[in-house]
């Protein structure tokens, strides 16, 4: 599909401090519009008037800057807005629009979407496993309440929404090699639990709002520093 292929190439674009995928991965994507199965990112035609307006939450994590670099090459620097609660390094700040965004502040999220005419939303904000286990209440808030805010604003404003899952959504009792799409998951971390919740919420949004979910699960082993790539 268009966005899955686009995301695979995003990771292939070397960027300072970014990581590059070396294995295929899957995302939870939610869209109120169907995309043709044979759509291709590079063959798709976008005029100046129908360029997507993109917001990336949690953009200072492992994936955001690399994705932004790809999207900005395709749609223009000003069409892609990075957001986070941390101060960006100089090279990120000067590369294109960056704003402060706390996903727990629903009113602020709505204002950002409306004021910037956002049409695509990549939701990367999350507390990962180790930090989440040490801060369970904060992980619940960011990974679950924050997700609900993102889902609500996406439904309200008819956005294309993309949320990554994780290999951590599976547990020790999950079947392996290969792991089927539908199987026992039973994760052992709050991060994994929150991602299972996100996957199930995607299915719920599909049934309630005719959105279209896909799932992507990846692990840290899926990624390696861009400097190590040929």
From Swiss-Prot:
InterPro entries: Epimerase_deHydtase, NAD(P)-bd_dom_sf, NAD(P)_epim/dehydratase. GO terms for cellular component: mitochondrial inner membrane. Expressed in all tissues examined. Detected in most cell types examined, but not observed in endothelial cells, glioma cell lines and some leukemia cell lines. It comes from the Eukaryota. Belongs to the NAD(P)-dependent epimerase/dehydratase family. Pfam families: Epimerase. It is found in: Mitochondrion. Keywords: Mitochondrion, Transit peptide. Its main location: mitochondrion. It comes from Homo sapiens. This is Inactive L-threonine 3-dehydrogenase, mitochondrial.
């Amino acid at each position: 599909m268009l966005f899955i292929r686009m995301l695979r190439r995003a990771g292939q674009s070397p960027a300072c401090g970014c990581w590059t995928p070396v294995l295929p991965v899957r995302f939870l994507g939610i869209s109120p519009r169907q995309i043709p199965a044979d759509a291709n990112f590079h063959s798709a035609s976008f005029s100046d008037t129908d360029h997507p307006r993109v917001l990336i939450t949690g953009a200072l994590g492992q994936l955001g800057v690399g994705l932004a670099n790809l999207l900005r090459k395709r749609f223009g620097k000003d069409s892609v807005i990075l957001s986070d609660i941390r101060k960006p390094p100089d090279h990120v700040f000067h590369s294109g629009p960056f704003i402060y965004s706390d996903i727990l502040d629903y009113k602020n999220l709505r204002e950002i979407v409306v004021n910037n005419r956002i049409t695509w939303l990549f939701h990367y904000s999350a507390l990962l496993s180790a930090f989440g286990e040490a801060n369970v209440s904060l992980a619940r808030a960011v990974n679950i309440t924050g997700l609900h805010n993102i889902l609500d604003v996406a439904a309200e404003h008819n956005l294309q929404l993309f949320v990554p899952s994780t290999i951590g959504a599976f547990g020790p009792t999950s079947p392996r090699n290969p792991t089927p799409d539908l199987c026992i998951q039973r994760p052992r971390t709050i991060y994994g639990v929150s991602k299972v919740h996100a996957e199930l919420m995607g299915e719920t949004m599909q049934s309630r709002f005719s959105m279209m979910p896909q799932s992507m699960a990846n692990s840290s082993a899926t990624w390696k520093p861009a400097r190590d790539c040929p």
